[in-house]
Amino acid sequence: MFEINVDPVAFSIGSLVVKWYGIMMALGVVALVSWIFWRIKRGANISYDTVLTAAIIAIPSGIVFAKLLHVIDAWEYYSLNPGAIFSGEGLTIFGAIIGATIGLWIYSRYSHFNLGYLLDVAVPGILLGQAIGRVGCLLNGCCYGEFGGTGCSVIYTNPATAAPYGVEVAPTQAYEIIFLLCLLTFSLFIAKKLRPDGQLFLLYISLYAAWRVAIGFVRVNDDFALGLEQAQVVGLILMAVAVPLFIYRLRKQKQTDKIT
C-alpha cells in the first residue's frame, strides 16, 4: 500500500486556483506539440505553420468535446450546477480525442494536408501527453479504482483529495500510466512497419479503446448504459470503427506491396 498526501491545489494567486491536474494537462499538450516539432526537425513532411494552426484548432475542439461527454455522463449533477459546465475539471479523454480529430478533419478539408500522416506522426506524442495527464489524475485523486486492500493499493490522506479520504483504492491511474508508456514504446517500433496514412493512429485508437473497456471493470464510475461506464461504451464504439478500418488499410498496403 502506498500513501499519497498531496494537496490537489499546486498554488493560488488571489482568486485564481491552479491545480496539479491542470498543470499536468497543460504539460501533456506541450509534450505532444514538442514531439511533433521534433519529428519535423527530423524530417517529417509537415510544416510548422500547419502544426501551430492544427493545435489552435484541436485544443479548443478537444476541450469542448471532452467536457460535452462528461456533461452527458453526469447530467444530473450539471443540471443542478450549470455553472460547473464551464469549469476546467470533468474532462474525458475520449471526448478530447474525438473533438480534436473532428476539428483537424475539418481543417484538413480546407488546408488539404494529409490528416492521416499528421495523426500518425502525433501518436507517440499523444501517448506521452496522456501519460503526463494521468499523473495529474493520480495526484488529484480522481479516476481511482475499486475499494479494498489489494496487494497494490493507494490511500489518499489529504483532506482536499478527490478520492475517498483514508480509504484504500486501486491506483488505476498508475496502471494506465504504465500501459500508455508501454504502448508508446510499441508505437515507436511498429510505426516503421506501417504506411503513414492513419494506420498507426487507428491502431492506437483500437488498443487504447480496448484498454479502457478492460480497466473500466476496475475503475469506480457510475453505469452509463448496459451496466458499463461511459468510457467503456465509447471504447466499444471506437473499436467497432477503428479495428475494421485498420485491417482494411493494412490489407490494402499488403496488396500494394505485392504489386510493386
From Swiss-Prot:
Q: In which pathway does it act?
A: Protein modification; lipoprotein biosynthesis (diacylglyceryl transfer)
| Any one Gene Ontology cellular component term annotated for this protein | plasma membrane
User: Principal place where this protein is found?
Assistant: membrane
Q: Where in the cell is it found?
A: Cell membrane
Q: Name one GO biological process term.
A: lipoprotein biosynthetic process
- Keyword field contains Transmembrane helix: yes
> What GO terms are given for molecular function?
phosphatidylglycerol-prolipoprotein diacylglyceryl transferase activity
Topology of this chain in the membrane: Multi-pass membrane protein
Q: In the UniProt record, does the keyword Transmembrane occur?
A: yes
Q: The organism sits in which domain of life?
A: Bacteria
* Keywords, in A-Z order: Cell membrane, Membrane, Transferase, Transmembrane, Transmembrane helix
**Bilayer-spanning residue ranges:** 17-37, 52-72, 85-105, 113-133, 170-190, 198-218, 227-247
Family under the similarity heading:
Belongs to the Lgt family.
Q: What does this protein do?
A: Catalyzes the transfer of the diacylglyceryl group from phosphatidylglycerol to the sulfhydryl group of the N-terminal cysteine of a prolipoprotein, the first step in the formation of mature lipoproteins.
What name goes with this protein? Phosphatidylglycerol--prolipoprotein diacylglyceryl transferase
Q: Which organism is it from?
A: Dehalococcoides mccartyi (strain ATCC BAA-2100 / JCM 16839 / KCTC 5957 / BAV1)
**Organism taxonomic ancestry:** Bacteria, Bacillati, Chloroflexota, Dehalococcoidia, Dehalococcoidales
